[in-house]
Every structure is written in structure tokens, then in C-alpha cells.
Curated annotation (Swiss-Prot):
Annotated PUA domain residues: 275-353
Reaction(s) catalysed by this chain's protein: L-glutamate + ATP = L-glutamyl 5-phosphate + ADP
EC assignment: 2.7.2.11
Record bears the keyword Nucleus: no
Protein name: Glutamate 5-kinase
Pfam families: AA_kinase (PF00696), PUA (PF01472)
Enzyme class: transferase
């Protein structure tokens, strides 16, 4: 559908448990129903789920939250499989498949792993599969301590090229003060820029099961906003909250991005110093400039410099004129080996492949 949106929905532990010590399955069923409804309407849904530790505790019958990181990781290891089984079971009611992705911050900071994660996420969405993302809590350390699922959801939104990020919590949104102890607190409905004043009034969650608070949600909104993604913080218990966000209705606190994702990407590609350059033939030049096509290895005449997969490179024509900048899907050595060859030969030449193109049109800005 032409107006299809990509929505990342992050569900905190407080939302999944309803403030109790157990997963609130009835509540999760309702959220899945809304996601399935939007999925059927042609929208692309990504789930970022907390709750592995809570699910592990419930399954093992632990009476209290352990104080050590190792104990939390034990619970996460047990609970993660229970959690994905629940998501799989509920989405299957609507004939929807899910795909699990376990990530850590390191996956986002390493260029190669970032691109691989993006490729996987894109493949899932393109095949109408709902990605279910969580931190790999069983091996992560700092992430568990800081409640990074909020920030992880922002990074997932960037990976997915999302239009909107919805952070569901146990509060209606961001207030001028903590509404739990200040009856004069008012809901902030629209935010056009995050400053120190806003950060100062962001309170923290009191959930004994989760690790995120309003402060980390503000960080996530800031990260997403810099990438041109709108963020909404809203109560997971609000009826129809996912539908409202898709339809753009007033709900919770809406963080308006300062620029569109395309503008942000253009700025990044143009702003990044090229790590190398490639020269292309006339056919490739015409395909790029006149038809807006991706660059195929067949059209590459030469490769200059040493660069890694995921770095920005300069694309020049045979006369030496810059025609585009783009993100290379292969490193310089690999490009030299596949230059001039058909895409079908990539795997035979390299022993692997990251797709048929050298630079994808979505990762390319023409001069």
C-alpha cells in the first residue's frame, strides 16, 4: 500500500507484566491483536520486547529479584525462550510468522555486524514476518544495568528505516513532574526538541522487574529523532494505542523529528569523508543518474583505496567526474575481485555474498 508505515513497538517489562510478577498474557494478547490488525492493513511491524528476566523468574518460581548480574542473566537465558514462544503462539493465531533477533550494543557499534543485522531485519520485513527483537541479556552486562532496551528500540527503528517508534510504558507519557507523587503534573503532548530542562523532569521507573525509566526513553527519542524518526511515549494499557499511533491521533507524548529520514541520510552520506572511490563505465553511469538504479559489480572498472564494507565511497565516471557518493556493501578487496562480473558470479568468486549490488540505490546520493 502506498501509505504503508514501518512502526517499531517497544514493550517494557511494566507493560508486559501489568505491574505484577508475572507476564500479563491477556494484555499481551490485546497488543498482538492491534499489531496483527495493522499488519493486515499493510503496515510493517517490529516488536522490541523486554520481559525475559520476568519470564524466567515466573517459569522457575523465583520469589525475589536476584541482586547479581549473573543471576539476572540466568533468568534471562531461561526466560528468553519462553518469551519468544509466547510471541510466536499469539501471532500465529493471525497467521503471522515471527523471527527472533537477539542483539547487544556491540552489534550496533561494529559496522559489519550492523549491516548484517540491517539485512536480516529488512529480509524479515520484506517477507511479511514480524521481527521480535530483544537484548541478548544472557551475555550482555552493561545493557542489563542501564535498561538499554529503550535505546535498543531506537537503534532497531534506524535499522528498520522506521517511520515511527512507539515506546509503551506504564505511564501516559512524559509529564511536567512525576504524576505518581505530584497531582499538579501535566502531560506534555508535543516535544519539538530535547533540552536539559526536559531531561531534568524525566523521572525513573519504579518497576522492580524492569531496568528502564523515563530517562532512557528520552534518550531513545533523541536518538530516533536525529535519524528523522517520530517517537511516541504512551501507556500500553490505553485501548487502541497502536492503532492511534499509526493513524497519527493524539496520544501520549509525541516527539517530532527535526528532519526526515532521507534528509538525515543525505546529510550523513555527503558529510562522511569518502574512504575510497570506484570508477564506473558509461552503462553504470546512465543507470545511476538517469534511472536511479543501484550500482552492480558489472559496471565497475576500477577500485581505489582500502575501505571496509559499510563505508562511504566516491563513485566517478570514466572522465573522473564525481557522479555519486554511496555506502559500499563490499570491502575494497572484494570489489576488486568482482568488478566487471555479473552479480550471479559473486558467490562463486568470493565464497559469500551480501546481495547482488555493490552500492544500493537507497544508500546512494547522486551529485
Amino acid at each position: 500500500m502506498s501509505n504503508s508505515q514501518t512502526l517499531v513497538v517497544k514493550l517494557g517489562t511494566s507493560v508486559l507484566t501489568g505491574g505484577s510478577r508475572r507476564l500479563n498474557r491477556a494484555h499481551i494478547v490485546e497488543l498482538v491483536r492491534q499489531c496483527a490488525q495493522q499488519h493486515a492493513a499493510g503496515h510493517r511491524i517490529v516488536i522490541v520486547t523486554s520481559g525475559a528476566i520476568a519470564a524466567g523468574r515466573e517459569h522457575l518460581g523465583y520469589p525475589e529479584l536476584p541482586a547479581t548480574i549473573a543471576s539476572k542473566q540466568l533468568l534471562a537465558a531461561v526466560g528468553q525462550s519462553r518469551l519468544i514462544q509466547l510471541w510466536e503462539q499469539l501471532f500465529s493465531i493471525y497467521g503471522i510468522h515471527v523471527g527472533q533477533m537477539l542483539l547487544t550494543r556491540a552489534d550496533m557499534e561494529d559496522r559489519e555486524r550492523f549491516l548484517n543485522a540491517r539485512d536480516t531485519l529488512t529480509a524479515l520485513l520484506d517477507n511479511r514476518i514480524v521481527p521480535v527483537i530483544n537484548e541478548n541479556d544472557a551475555v550482555a552486562t552493561a545493557e542489563i544495568k542501564v535498561g538499554d532496551n529503550d535505546n535498543l528500540s531506537a537503534l532497531a527503528a534506524i535499522l528498520a528505516g522506521a517511520d515511527k517508534l512507539l515506546l509503551l510504558t506504564d505511564q501516559q507519557g512524559l509529564f511536567t513532574a512525576d504524576p505518581r507523587n505530584n497531582p499538579q503534573a501535566e502531560l506534555i503532548q508535543d516535544v519539538y526538541g530535547i533540552d536539559d530542562t526536559l531531561r531534568a523532569i524525566a523521572g525513573d521507573s519504579v518497576s522492580g522487574l524492569g531496568t528502564g525509566g523515563m530517562g532512557t526513553k528520552l534518550q531513545a527519542a533523541d536518538v530516533a529523532g536525529r535519524a528523522g524518526i517520530e517517537t511516541v511515549i504512551a501507556a500500553g494499557s490505553k485501548p487502541g494505542v497502536i492503532n492511534d499511533v499509526i493513524e497519527g491521533l493524539p496520544v501520549g507524548t509525541r516527539f517530532h523529528p527535526q528532519q526526515t529520514p532521507l534528509e538525515n541520510r543525505k546529510r550523513w552520506i555527503f558529510g562522511a569523508p569518502p574512504a575510497g572511490e570506484i570508477t564506473v563505465d558509461e552503462g553504470a553511469q546512465s543507470a545511476i543518474l538517469e534511472r536511479g538504479s543501484s550500482l552492480l559489480p558489472k559496471g565497475i572498472k576500477s577500485v581505489t583505496g582500502n575501505f571496509s564494507r559499510g563505508e562511504v565511497i566516491r563513485i566517478r565516471n570514466l572522465e573522473g567526474r564525481d557522479i555519486a557518493h554511496g555506502v559500499s556493501r563490499y570491502n575494497s578487496d572484494a570489489l576488486r575481485r568482482i568488478a566487471g562480473h555479473h552479480s550471479q558470479q559473486i558467490d562463486a568468486i568470493l565464497g559469500y555474498e551480501y546481495g547482488p549490488v555493490a552500492v544500493h540505490r537507497d544508500d546512494m546520493i547522486t551529485q
